[in-house]
Structure formats: structure tokens, C-alpha cells
A protein has these predicted regions:
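Patatin-like phospholipase
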Residues: 1-19, 27-151
Length: 151
């Protein structure tokens, strides 16, 4: 978030792409959630509750479905759609069948952010336009984002 704070302070206009936590912060920023609010949300005890829900609940229920994260993002962002954002945004996730990075440029913002934040072994993958998506992948094991060309 520090980079976004400096760019905003200097009046530099940006397009945003991200993977995993970068998609969570970048998507909220592109939806014009203030950086101060994003920071407050990450430090808020309710968000900590959501983050704790990410942990798998072996053996009773298996891996986290990510539904708590999805509910949280929906409450924060409403029905925002990527293609309608005033700040260009793309989330990046990995197709688990092919290992190829998939750039999410349109559709529900909360769903794209949730897909990009689907840490393997922690979250269930997300279905998106015929792909089964997780964060990272063989080409980007840390969830790092390939450079994405945005307008």
C-alpha cells in the first residue's frame, strides 16, 4: 500500500493489477475505496475474524471454501464490476488445469479478487469463465503478477 500512497500523494494516475493480496488491495483501490479505509479494514478485528476463517478446519470440514472472504469483499465493494471501474484493474490467477496465468479484466470485482486470493491448500479454487482458478501456479508460485497491459 505504501507505493499507492506515494503515487496518490504525488498525483500520479495508475492502472492496477495484482495477484493474491495484491489483488485484494488493488481491487479495493480501483473501486475507489480510500487507502485510509483499506488500511483500517486490514487492521480491523472483523477482518481478522475473516482472515482466521481462511485456516483449514481439518478433518471435520476440509479446506476453507472462502465464503467468508467473498462475503467480506461483497460488503466492501458492493456489485462493482471490473469493466466499470474508473481506475483500470486486472486480477491475475492461475488455471489449475493448465498452469497458465489468467488475467481477469471483466466481471464481478469481488469474485475476481476472491479467485486471485485463492491460496492453494487453504482455499477452494474458484470457477471463472470455464477456468478453475487459484493464486500463483508453476509460472508464478508466489502469486507474483506478470506485467499486465492496462489502458
Amino acid at each position: 500500500m505504501g507505493v499507492l500512497q506515494v503515487l496518490e500523494r504525488e498525483g500520479v494516475l495508475v492502472s492496477v493489477s495484482g495477484a493474491s493480496i495484491g489483488a485484494l488491495v488493488g481491487g479495493a483501490y480501483a473501486a475507489e475505496v480510500s487507502l485510509a479505509r483499506i488500511e483500517r479494514e486490514w487492521l480491523d478485528t472483523d477482518l481478522l475474524k475473516v482472515m482466521r476463517s481462511f485456516l483449514p478446519t481439518f478433518p471435520r470440514a476440509g479446506l476453507s471454501s472462502g465464503s467468508e472472504l467473498r462475503k467480506y469483499l461483497q460488503a466492501l465493494l458492493g456489485d462493482a464490476r471490473i469493466e466499470e471501474l474508473s481506475i483500470p484493474f486486472a486480477a491475475v490467477a492461475c488455471d489449475i488445469d493448465t498452469g497458465v496465468a489468467v488475467v481477469l479484466r471483466r466481471g464481478p470485482l469481488a469474485d475476481a479478487m476472491r479467485a486471485s486470493a485463492s491460496i492453494p491448500g487453504i482455499f477452494h479454487p474458484v470457477r471463472w469463465e470455464g477456468h478453475l482458478l487459484l493464486a500463483g501456479g508453476p509460472d508464478h508460485p508466489s502469486g507474483s503478477t506478470p506485467w499486465v497491459k492496462l489502458p
